[in-house]
Amino acid sequence: MTELELLGPRASGEPLGTAVLKAVAEDFQVDEVLDIPLSGQGEHLWLWVEKRDLNTEEAARRLARAAGVPVRSISYAGLKDRQALTRQWFSLHLPGKADPDLSRAEDASLRVLKQVRHQRKLQRGAHSANGFTLRLTALAADHQAVDARLEQLRQQGVPNYFGTQRFGHGGGNVHDALDWAARKALPEQRNVRSRLLSAGRSYLFNQLLAARVADGSWARAQVGDLLAFTDSRSFFPAGEAECADPRLAILDLHPTGPMWGEGASPAGAAPAQLENAIGARQPALCQWLAQAGMDHERRILRLPIGGLTWHYPEPDILQLEFVLPAGCFATVVVREVVDLVSAGQTDSPCVF
């Protein structure tokens, strides 16, 4: 499956050129934002960890081994990219135990930067946002055009697609999810089950968002929409008055799309008709998600880009800094500006 099939059309026009992202880990830096004051005491040891070219699950296993505890005793708020330099929190459950020596877990790919005790473990999804610093190298695009596009994105946001990372190489996770859905069965391994359910659900959401981008309604509230604030999981229906709410214009309030699961969508009017039409394309997948116990939830269609700044350290390097809500993808911001190519493709005359 192509990127266009997995995500959908761009909202800002054609890409302005090409660039490389993640030539080295330092080109893609992520800092987890966690608004939880830590008490300094308790049976949970919280760790602020820097990882380089290491995924979250492997880091958790290494920390658990070094601490001498089962991997189920370690928690984290969210998964971070492997091919990146990331800093995120973990927590170890150590009732009645002293702080362990974690040096055995450390090497060039993992460093424990800070450790603090707290009364509670770190919950999944507890982080409020992620801060990104991206360096796009081998940039082949006009700076003035890039500046204008980024200013447009700062003011209008971008479609809140799930990035291709969610779907595996070539959309393999989606293919696998569709296969399991057709068999009306679930993988026994919990991590595989979670990955495929997430991929299937995200794929359906992207299909809905792609249709809203195509008809220009992704950033505009319609009667029957369900609206939500950027950092809220609650939502409310839109009537004529709500569609004129000034908070829509300043990117505080957004239309939402369905995260398919058990129960009918509370949307109405034209948005409900579109959601039903998208679901009708993949009835087995929708039923599979519901039978797996997934709840019907909502996700904002428009992604505001917090604190967006940029500069050019070199003529062919664009550095971006911004903050996104938890669960949102930095690469969907970049794709609205340039096409990303692998480092080995940048010398091809056909790229630009």
Curated annotation (Swiss-Prot):
InterPro entries: PsdUridine_synth_cat_dom_sf (IPR020103), PsdUridine_synth_TruD (IPR001656), PsdUridine_synth_TruD_CS (IPR020119), PsdUridine_synth_TruD_insert (IPR011760), TruD_catalytic (IPR042214), TruD_insert_sf (IPR043165), TruD_pseudoU_synthase (IPR050170). It catalyses: uridine(13) in tRNA = pseudouridine(13) in tRNA. The active site is at D81. One of its GO terms (cellular component) is cytosol. Residues 157-303 form the TRUD domain. CDD domains: PseudoU_synth_EcTruD. Pfam families: TruD. Keywords: Isomerase, tRNA processing. Responsible for synthesis of pseudouridine from uracil-13 in transfer RNAs. Belongs to the pseudouridine synthase TruD family. This is tRNA pseudouridine synthase D. It comes from Pseudomonas putida (strain ATCC 700007 / DSM 6899 / JCM 31910 / BCRC 17059 / LMG 24140 / F1).
